[in-house]
Amino acid sequence: MLGTGTPRLNPDRSGPSTAIVVGDRAYLIDFGPGVVRRAAAAARKGFPALEPPKISVAFLTHLHSDHTAGYPDLILSPWVFGREKLDVYGPEGTEEMTQHLLMAYRRDIEIRTNGMEKKPPLVVHAHDVRPGVVYKDDRVTVKAFAVPHGEWPQAFGYRFETPDRVIVISGDTSPSDELVANCQPCDVLIHEVQLPSYNVETMPDWPAYRARYHTTTDQLAELANRAKPGLLVGYHNGGTEEALRDILQQIQRTYRGRVVVARDLDVF
């Protein structure tokens, strides 16, 4: 779990980003603020596949800024230190965002390739994808499925099938029957979760917003009882340690399976 936070400016919780590591390869999902340095930290903790120049395949669940603000860093920094190419898969708009970022950093890229550094060309292949199998290699098969996230016309969850595990990641979503179907079966479900009281003081319309965009503790417990993952991992919450304990306790009121609430750099 590279980043488990929200748009809240919590220095202990980077923006949403998850890595699936299969042997010597890492597959990145979402690029919240701080993603590249969190990957470097994970590499130091025993996951060399997460050395940033080695990350070459990545996926976006949707294009909210808290999930994409680290994208320029992911494009540029690993390239500066030797990455050969990057393939990025995501909903409609991923290609457009990538093109605009490359244009925004055009002068930097030109100086690094044509100046004294003599960097090789920056190669980024962005792919707008639709639900279904979007990526496959000899380690993993990745399936995208649609999830409901407010006004976003496309938001995805992903199902990763590896030789020994099936991992499902929700992205941002309100409760989703499609997600439950994609957990049949799954070893690990990584799902966003929000306290019902989160943001109420500063955002009076939060309950209405949350109902369309996110999943509460009680809703996640109900969903997990249907999905039956081997392990449920809650993420994408920006609260204090007390809030994390509250989230766990509220889920456990009605869900008896294995469940944890993730912190940055946790490993499962």
What is the meaning of each model-derived region?
Residues G157, D164-V166, S174-D266:
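Cap/insert and terminal regions of metallo-dependent hydrolase folds
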Residues M1-V168, D246-F268:
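Binuclear metal-dependent hydrolase catalytic cores
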